Curated annotation (Swiss-Prot):
Ranges of biased composition (kind: Polar residues): 212-221
Compositionally biased residues, Basic and acidic residues: 33-42, 53-63, 72-147
Biased composition (Low complexity): 43-52
Segments for region (Disordered): 1-221
Family (UniProt): Belongs to the LEA type 4 family.
The name this protein goes by in its record: Late embryogenesis abundant protein, group 3
Length: 221
């Protein structure tokens, strides 16, 4: 009976010991697991913190890099804008200078053209005036020549008419004198005065010559 109780006690003690051992092992394992979990959590937290710090630093660096990039781009844009503005000013200056030069050349060409036109007009006017004077002089000379010819023709016509008139008068006078002398001779012959007839003929011839001389003098005048 006692052996049976001792055995039961022994078994109970072993069971308790094993239970305690298992409990201790379980507790130790739990502690180990908890520590391991804690360590892992700490590592994770540290890693996360490191990542966060790294991310923060990376963000800062990125922001800095972005700021530097933007600043660089801004400076480049400003520089480019400055170059563009300077080039625009230079181009505008060249364009203005070219426009002024072109305007000056155009004005000078216009003045020269106007001067040439004025000179041509003066020359043409002078030529026209000279031609008009020459034409007037030629017309006046022609008029004088025609007037002289007309005067000469009138003079010649008058002299010719005078000569003709003088010839007709002289012829008529001679015919009248001849007829008168004939009648006188007939009368003298009838009266028997032939000697006187010769004297009368002499007188008649003298009168005839005198008349001819008078006619000649009149015709010459």
């Amino acid at each position: 009976m006692a052996s049976h109780q001792d055995k039961a006690s022994y078994q109970a003690g072993e069971t308790k010991a094993r239970t305690e051992e298992k409990t201790g092992q379980a507790v130790g394992a739990t502690k180990d697991t908890a520590q391991h979990a804690k360590d892992r959590a700490a590592d994770a937290a540290g890693h996360a913190a490191g990542k966060g710090q790294d991310a923060k630093e990376a963000t800062k660096q990125k922001a800095s890099d972005t700021g530097s990039y933007l600043g660089k781009k801004t400076d480049e844009a400003k520089h480019k804008a400055g170059e563009t503005t300077e080039a625009t000013k230079h181009k505008a200056g060249e364009t203005t200078e070219a426009a002024k030069q072109k305007a000056g050349e155009t004005t000078e060409a216009a003045k020269q053209k106007a001067g040439e036109t004025t000179e041509t007009t003066k020359q043409k006017a002078g030529e026209t005036t000279e031609a008009a004077r020459q034409k007037a002089a030629d017309a006046m000379e022609a008029a004088k020549q025609k007037a002289a010819e007309a005067g000469q023709y009138a003079k010649d016509t008058a002299v010719s008419g005078k000569d003709k008139s003088g010839g007709v008068i002289q012829q008529a006078t001679e015919q009248v004198k001849s007829a008168a002398a004939g009648r006188k001779d007939a009368v003298m012959s009838t009266l028997g005065m032939g000697g006187d007839n010769k004297q009368g003929d002499a007188n008649t011839n003298t009168n005839t010559n005198t008349t001819k001389d008078s006619s000649t003098i009149t015709r010459d005048h």
